[in-house]
């Protein structure tokens, strides 16, 4: 029987004694009829149960919350079996093992294992802190965050990947990057089993199951499931474009778009396919390409069951069921499937051609045309038909070509119902009806 370390005072409701104050009482500073707590070991007096319990553990060496991860694994390094005397410390300690990060920043997609961590980080958004950046004037709460923030201005990248030599400003960034080499995807969805290498991607995916959209625009009421989409949408109201290319003078509203744009100048393609060696500017293009090897089609239409490899194709397809009208150009009225294609089309009116070939100087108004042109210099034909082996420089060409083998004819004449493998063939045919009229 353990020593009774704490006893309720006379006149209390139950008079029960405890070896430790119960957890449900810890959040109460005092209770009616309960006196201050005196330690039998050292004689120190405490007004609260929590302080009393902590002191008892210090005196007796009692550590009730033991981490099973340390007990289960025979660690070869200097890591010891950890025992923590406070239950909330134990829960916080366990999170690196479970990868649980329950505290989300409402401003961005970063998540944290403890309230203290997120409070410290939130100051980077509010700008209320004692450490002021000499470059931009931003104030930070913590010296380590201040030093880390300064690297965004100085360009210092002290953390290097041992596999490929790529350098990063933050230690956490190099750890995440290393997963591209190891293939580690530690965050697994309990609903569908899909795995992710980033906690932010995992949480965003979870919301596709729950339908949760916690980020709501104050201007128009539109809601979003991730902060990046929400902030991007906000800029459609403000017109803000905070990311400017110093080489070309082009301003962009999204950091990811800015980074992708800069790779056009540097030629950097950090995302490399392990199967065929092809490299990509953006992670989304890389993931789409990976599916060409695996055959994965994660986007499935609930109406007809048709599946797609990328979200944009899926969204375009959904409009065939909803009857949603595509967006139109303000200059000429031409209709397009998305705002992205309106922007690209708009360059035909402005004459803007932001993508220039380093080999011959030829410029292009859209990135896909630029990449296609680059392949004419390299002689590269990365898209090969699985049926006959014929190779193509562009993904759209192989999709059209494969319809010869599959017999798919997705473009149908509204007048007579005749179907075609290409939209241009369908439009040409439809004109025969107007001529006959």
UniProtKB/Swiss-Prot annotation:
GO BP: regulation of transcription by RNA polymerase II
A Pfam family that the UniProt record links to this protein: zf-C2H2
Gene3D superfamilies: Classic Zinc Finger
Main localisation: nucleus
Molecular-function annotations in GO: DNA-binding transcription factor activity, RNA polymerase II-specific; RNA polymerase II transcription regulatory region sequence-specific DNA binding; zinc ion binding
Top-level lineage group: Eukaryota
Coiled coil: none
This protein's record includes keyword Amino-acid biosynthesis: no
Keyword Signal recorded: no
GO CC annotations, alphabetized: nucleus
Keywords, sorted A to Z: DNA-binding, Metal-binding, Nucleus, Repeat, Transcription, Transcription regulation, Zinc, Zinc-finger
Location in the cell: Nucleus
Zinc finger (C2H2-type): 35-59, 103-125, 131-153, 159-181, 187-209, 215-237, 243-265, 271-293, 299-321, 327-349, 355-377, 383-405, 411-433
Family: Belongs to the krueppel C2H2-type zinc-finger protein family.
Physiological role: May be involved in transcriptional regulation.
Protein name: Zinc finger protein 491
Record organism: Homo sapiens
């Amino acid at each position: 029987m353990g020593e009774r370390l704490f006893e309720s005072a006379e006149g209390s409701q139950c008079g029960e004694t405890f070896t430790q104050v119960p957890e449900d009482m810890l959040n109460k500073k005092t209770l009616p009829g309960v006196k201050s707590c005196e330690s039998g070991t050292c004689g120190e007096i405490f007004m609260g149960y929590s302080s009393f319990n902590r002191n008892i553990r210090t005196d007796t060496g009692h550590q009730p919350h033991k981490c099973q991860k340390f007990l289960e694994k025979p660690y070869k390094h200097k890591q010891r079996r950890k025992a923590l005397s406070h239950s909330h410390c134990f829960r916080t300690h366990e999170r690196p093992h479970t990868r649980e990060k329950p505290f989300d920043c409402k401003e961005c997609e970063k998540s944290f294992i403890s309230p203290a961590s997120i409070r410290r980080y939130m100051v980077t958004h509010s700008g209320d802190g004692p450490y002021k950046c000499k470059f931009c004037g931003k104030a930070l709460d913590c010296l380590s965050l201040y030093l880390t923030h300064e690297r965004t201005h100085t360009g210092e990248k002290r953390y290097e990947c041992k596999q490929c030599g790529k350098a990063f400003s933050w230690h956490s960034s190099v750890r995440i990057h290393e997963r591209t080499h190891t293939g580690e995807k530690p965050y697994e969805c309990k609903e569908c089993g899909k795995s992710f290498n980033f906690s932010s991607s995992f949480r965003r995916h979870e919301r596709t199951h729950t339908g949760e959209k916690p980020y709501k625009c104050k201007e128009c009421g539109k809601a979003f499931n991730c902060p990046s989409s929400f902030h991007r949408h906000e800029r459609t109201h403000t017109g803000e474009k905070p990311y400017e290319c110093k080489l070309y003078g082009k301003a962009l509203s999204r950091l990811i778009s800015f980074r992708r744009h800069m790779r056009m100048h540097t030629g950097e393609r950090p995302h490399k396919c392990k199967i065929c060696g092809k490299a990509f500017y953006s992670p989304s293009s890389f993931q789409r390409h990976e599916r060409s090897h695996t055959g994965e089609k994660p986007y499935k239409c609930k109406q007809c069951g048709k599946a797609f490899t990328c979200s944009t194709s899926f969204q375009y397809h959904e409009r065939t069921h909803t009857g949603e009208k595509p967006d139109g150009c303000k200059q000429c009225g031409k209709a397009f499937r998305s705002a992205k294609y309106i922007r690209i089309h708009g360059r035909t009116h402005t004459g803007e051609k932001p993508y220039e070939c380093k080999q011959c100087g030829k410029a292009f108004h859209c990135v896909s045309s630029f990449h296609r042109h680059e392949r004419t210099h390299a002689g590269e034909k990365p898209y090969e038909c699985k049926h006959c082996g014929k190779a193509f420089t562009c993904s759209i060409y192989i999709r059209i070509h494969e319809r010869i083998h599959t017999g798919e004819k997705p473009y149908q004449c509204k007048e007579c119902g005749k179907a075609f493998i290409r939209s241009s063939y369908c439009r040409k045919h439809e004109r025969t009806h107007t001529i006959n009229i």
